[in-house]
């Protein structure tokens, strides 16, 4: 199951997307790459392993003065059919 966590502060926002299987990893990475390619404002992206076998893809926008990342994150959540985002 793919789930997500969102965090935002002044001029900073982060979406962390957690997944378990290779299929989920492929789905997440391909769709995130496709969405990011559509925009000129590029994030920092990194992946990390967490306990219980999950991996997390973290997408961070810094100096997001115009809050462009919100629409980008919403598009990611929608295309990945994430039902719950904390």
Segments the model singles out, each with a brief description of its role:
Residues 5-7, 49, 72:
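Generic marker of residues within folded, mature protein domains
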Residues 41-48, 77-86:
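Conserved short beta-strand edge segments in small beta-sheet-based binding/regulatory domains
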Residues 2-42:
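N-terminal acidic leader/helix
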Residues 70-77:
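Charge-biased C-terminal accessory regions appended to nucleic-acid-, cytoskeletal NTPase
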Residues 26-29, 33-70:
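Acidic, low-complexity, intrinsically disordered interaction modules
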Residues 20, 40, 61, 80-81:
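Short, flexible coil/linker elements and helix-boundary hinge sites characteristic
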């Amino acid at each position: 199951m793919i789930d997500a966590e969102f965090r935002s502060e002044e001029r900073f926002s982060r979406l962390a997307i957690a997944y378990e299987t290779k299929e989920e990893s492929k789905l997440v990475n391909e769709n995130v790459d496709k969405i990011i390619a559509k925009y000129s404002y590029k994030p920092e992206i990194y992946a990390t392993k967490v306990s219980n076998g999950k991996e997390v893809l973290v997408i961070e926008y810094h100096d997001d003065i115009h809050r462009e990342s919100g629409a980008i994150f919403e598009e990611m959540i929608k295309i990945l059919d994430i039902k719950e985002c904390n």
